[in-house]
From Swiss-Prot:
Family note: Belongs to the binding-protein-dependent transport system permease family. CysTW subfamily.
Assembly: The complex is composed of two ATP-binding proteins (CysA), two transmembrane proteins (CysT and CysW) and a solute-binding protein (CysP).
Gene Ontology CC entries for this record: plasma membrane
Main location as per UniProt: membrane
Keywords: Cell inner membrane, Cell membrane, Membrane, Stress response, Sulfate transport, Transmembrane, Transmembrane helix, Transport
Biological function: Part of the ABC transporter complex CysAWTP (TC 3.A.1.6.1) involved in sulfate/thiosulfate import. Probably responsible for the translocation of the substrate across the membrane.
Stretches that traverse the bilayer: 22-42, 67-87, 102-122, 139-159, 188-208, 217-237, 246-266
Protein known as: Sulfate transport system permease protein CysT
Induction or repression: By sulfur deprivation.
Cited Pfam families: BPD_transp_1
ABC transmembrane type-1 domain: residues covered: 63-266
Length: 278
């Protein structure tokens, strides 16, 4: 008598739903393959050449400007985004809907137009720049201009992630804390912040990612000077203009790698906050 192993009527792949398969095919074509291709292109170069291109002084300076200002912009929006979300959810005032719609303007506005607008307002002869220039303060075509552009394009992320969380909070909890003698600052730190902290960190992470990759607005409002306000995305574009595809690929890989590491850290903090408050 011969033994027959039971045959599988369906393979593992056929048991998967079409939505699952479509999701993975879509992500593979749009996200995974381009990222892997970038790393493979860099890995095709000799290791010494990769190190040389990645650690050029101008590239290192561009990394510092890019990540330093992106983190600063994300932190600023983390603070002011919460304040704006608080105002939108806790107060009624004339023109509130119009004010709320303006928050999403950086999403819809082309980045080049955003850069042109900021340069028009904050240049030495701009609407605001002309009043601060006599005091020796220059925003446009400096690192301050880069920071301003990054703050502008990443502002909506924190506001839109925190706003629904604030709407879910019960006002009675805040009133109870106040009735028990808690000060407004104590109420914020102990009652309001813990449940919205994961949303704040999520918005900060999204805003940081957006700021790191920003090009259109920064290239207009900054001076794009090496070792001063030149950011990595603009440096990559300059390398491509010089037909230095190897340099552009390596710098892009470094930028992507460091961004992934920082996002991993922020997401880890977000998960920790969710478990701590859950």
């Amino acid at each position: 008598m011969s033994l027959r192993l039971p045959s599988l009527s369906f393979t593992w792949l056929t048991r998967l739903s079409w939505s699952w398969r479509f999701t993975w095919v879509y992500l593979t074509l749009i996200l995974f393959i381009p990222i892997i291709a970038l790393f493979l292109k860099s890995a095709s170069l000799p290791l010494g050449r990769i190190w040389e291109l990645a650690t050029q002084p101008v590239a290192v300076a561009a990394y510092e400007v890019t990540f330093g200002l992106s983190l600063a912009a994300a932190a600023l929006n983390g603070v002011f985004g919460v304040i704006i979300a608080w105002v939108l959810t806790r107060y009624d005032f004339p023109g509130k809907k119009l004010f709320d719609s303006f928050i999403d303007l950086p999403f819809a506005l082309p980045t080049a137009v955003a850069g042109l607008t900021l340069a028009t307002v904050y240049s030495d002869k701009g609407w605001i720049g002309q009043f601060i220039a006599p005091f020796g303060v220059q925003i446009a075509f400096t690192r301050w201009g880069v920071l301003l552009a990054m703050v502008f394009i990443s502002l909506p992320f924190v506001v839109r992630t925190v706003e629904p969380l604030l709407l879910e909070l019960e006002v009675e909890a805040e009133e109870a804390a106040a009735s028990l003698g808690a000060s407004p600052s104590e109420t914020f730190w102990r009652v309001i912040l813990p449940p919205i902290l994961p949303g704040v960190l999520a918005g900060v992470a999204q805003g940081f990612s957006r700021a790191v990759g920003e090009f259109g607005s920064v290239v207009i409002i900054s001076g794009n000077l090496p070792f001063d306000d030149l950011i990595a995305p603009v440096l990559i574009f300059e390398r491509l203009e010089q037909y230095d595809y190897a340099g552009a690929t390596v710098i892009g890989s470094v930028l992507l790698l460091f961004s992934l590491v920082i996002l991993f850290v922020i997401n880890a903090l977000q998960n920790w906050s969710s478990r701590y408050n859950g």
